[in-house]
């Protein structure tokens, strides 16, 4: 045996290996393993099609298994009303299995590709007129999370949230992405360079905190 070279690792990450399961069967198998293995599970839900399907599958399986889940939804303020209505409808549909629904309406910064004059967008920015008001039960208090810093980026927030949610114990943040949408998304799952939660679970990614 010889050590796997970088080129070999890259090639192994490029090619898909068909499984004997279809996508739905594989997703249910992975979600079931997660619910059975980890004591705390949170679905990252954007209101879009991929994360919406992930929430449906996870909540339905949790209901069948008598488990509870949490949901993270980051409200970007300038969102379509139909998206907000959809988020609210799923929240109500699975209220029996959702232990905590973290509806985030805090100032967060992200890239803005819609303006040449404002390359970054900060939702819920203090002292400006908002596009719409957040729900009454949304998290708007900057002191709710010990890690929160005003205007922190979306990427920083989700990393810190995952660490906070884990409570320094094994936990899962569930995301729904389709590898066919882009090569970057495929590599995010298939890469051999990432740290996995378990060696035989290549679809997992381990965070430094162990979740």
Give the residues covered by each predicted segment:
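ATP-dependent adenylation/nucleotidyltransferase module used to activate substrates
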Residues: 2-211
């Amino acid at each position: 045996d010889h050590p796997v070279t970088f080129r070999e690792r890259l090639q192994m990450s490029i090619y898909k290996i068909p499984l004997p399961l279809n996508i739905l069967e594989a997703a249910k198998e992975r979600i079931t393993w997660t619910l059975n293995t980890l004591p705390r599970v949170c679905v990252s839900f954007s209101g879009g099609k991929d994360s919406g399907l992930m929430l449906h599958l996870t909540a339905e399986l949790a209901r069948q298994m008598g488990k509870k889940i949490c949901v993270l939804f980051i409200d970007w303020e300038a969102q379509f009303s139909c998206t907000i209505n959809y988020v609210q409808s799923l929240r109500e549909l699975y209220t029996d299995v959702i232990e905590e629904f973290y509806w985030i309406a805090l100032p967060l910064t992200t890239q803005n590709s819609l303006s040449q004059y404002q390359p970054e967008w900060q939702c819920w920015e203090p002292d400006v007129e908002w596009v719409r008001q957040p729900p009454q039960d949304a998290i708007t208090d900057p002191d709710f999370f010990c890690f929160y810093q005003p205007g922190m980026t979306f990427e920083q927030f989700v990393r810190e949230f995952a660490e906070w949610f884990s409570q320094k114990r094994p936990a899962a943040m569930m995301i729904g992405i389709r590898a066919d949408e882009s090569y970057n998304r495929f590599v995010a799952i298939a890469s051999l360079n990432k740290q996995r939660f378990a060696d035989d679970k290549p679809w997992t990614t381990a965070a430094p905190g162990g979740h």
